[in-house]
Amino acid sequence: MESIFHERQEGSLCAQHCLNNLLQGEYFSPVELSSIAQQLDEEERMRMAEGGVSSEEYRTFLQQPSVNMDDSGFFSIQVISNALKVWGLELILFNSPEYQRLGIDPINEKSFICNYKEHWFTVRKLGKQWFNLNSLLMGPELISDTYLALFLAQLQQEGYSIFVVKGDLPDCEADQLLQMIRVQQVQRPKLIGEETAQSRDQRLPRSDVDQAIEVSHPFDGTGMLDEDEENFQRALALSRQEIDMEDEEADLRRAIQLSMQGSRQSEFSNSLPQNASQPPHTSQTDSLSSEDLRRRRQAYFEKQQQQLQQQDLTLNLHDKPTINSSTLEADPGGDMSEEDMLQAAMNMSLESARNHLSTEEKK
């Protein structure tokens, strides 16, 4: 591969690189190609002058720039064709009806020149193998015989113009060497600037914005996430779930706390005013309005009713120490806990029940 002559792209001098890679040597320079282009411009001017130098067509032609070259280094197919005539070489359009009628297998040709949007490059056979000598590549690219036809068909489909080079090419060292040996290429050569761009991307740390853009735009049409992106998305989903669970648990704890506080305050407030304002002989239903306390007291009274009937109900129940409304009024509850308040309410309810049973027994 080292013996193959390969010029790399400089500016827009692809026509020069195409010719030199085809001929396998530094045969043409920009100055020589510019001279050929100027000769073509002069020949065209002389043909236009035959119609009269005062004609509108001639004046318009003089005002237009050259179609054979420009300041960037581009050269037309006419310049390349005239340059090859010096070496007895001729260009034939590959997909022209005249060439297609010949029915020649591309493998049996010697070289091709390809053009697309003002870029020229050579595909040539050296020894017994084909090589893509595109000046945009870092080096020659090996093309197998079976792939050559597909390669040319792909270029045509992409809009390339392909020309077959007819004639005997100058002898070169690479052609002689590759007649004796065959080369193998493990890795395709990279484009010029591709390796530099990759190494620069590896050296520069990615910012958070670049990483975010990379995650939110996955995927170049494949719809697949790589491993890092999948892990990131999974961690993000788990984080959101944990936050939602924590919020729900916090809301639940606050709701339970408020419910317990409201229930205790309601039980105490419903029992305290009614027992304090009503006489001791009011009924159990009138003394407490809280449904929960009523159910609790009713269950308790049913369990104790038989025991109370067996005891002497004529005893002076008022002599027993009880907690009545006056006791609660004496202690406004500034130092009482919620449990003390609940116990006081239960004792008051029990006192009311006992008074009621005593009244019924006397009747």
Swiss-Prot record:
GO terms for biological process: cellular response to amino acid starvation; cellular response to misfolded protein; monoubiquitinated protein deubiquitination; negative regulation of TORC1 signaling; positive regulation of ERAD pathway; proteasome-mediated ubiquitin-dependent protein catabolic process; protein quality control for misfolded or incompletely synthesized proteins. Residues 1-180 form the Josephin domain. It is a peripheral membrane protein. Signal peptide: none annotated. PROSITE patterns: JOSEPHIN, UIM. GO terms for cellular component: lysosomal membrane; nuclear matrix; nucleus. It catalyses: Thiol-dependent hydrolysis of ester, thioester, amide, peptide and isopeptide bonds formed by the C-terminal Gly of ubiquitin (a 76-residue protein attached to proteins as an intracellular targeting signal). It comes from the Eukaryota. Keywords: Hydrolase, Lysosome, Membrane, Nucleus, Protease, Repeat, Thiol protease, Transcription, Transcription regulation, Ubl conjugation pathway. The active site is at residues 14, 119, 134. The keyword Nucleus applies. InterPro entries: Ataxin-3 (IPR033865), Josephin (IPR006155), UIM_dom (IPR003903). Residues 260-290 have a biased composition (Polar residues). GO terms for molecular function: cysteine-type deubiquitinase activity; ubiquitin protein ligase binding. It is found in: Nucleus matrix; Nucleus; Lysosome membrane. Widely expressed. It is an enzyme of class 3 (hydrolase). Residues 227-246, 247-266, 337-356 form the UIM domain. Residues 192-209, 353-363 have a biased composition (Basic and acidic residues). Its EC number is 3.4.19.12. Residues 192-212, 260-363 are annotated as: Disordered. Pfam families: Josephin (PF02099), SUIM_assoc (PF16619), UIM (PF02809). Deubiquitinating enzyme involved in protein homeostasis maintenance, transcription, cytoskeleton regulation, myogenesis and degradation of misfolded chaperone substrates. Binds long polyubiquitin chains and trims them, while it has weak or no activity against chains of 4 or less ubiquitins. Involved in degradation of misfolded chaperone substrates via its interaction with STUB1/CHIP: recruited to monoubiquitinated STUB1/CHIP, and restricts the length of ubiquitin chain attached to STUB1/CHIP substrates and preventing further chain extension. The UIM domains bind ubiquitin and interact with various E3 ubiquitin-protein ligase, such as STUB1/CHIP. They are essential to limit the length of ubiquitin chains. This is Ataxin-3.
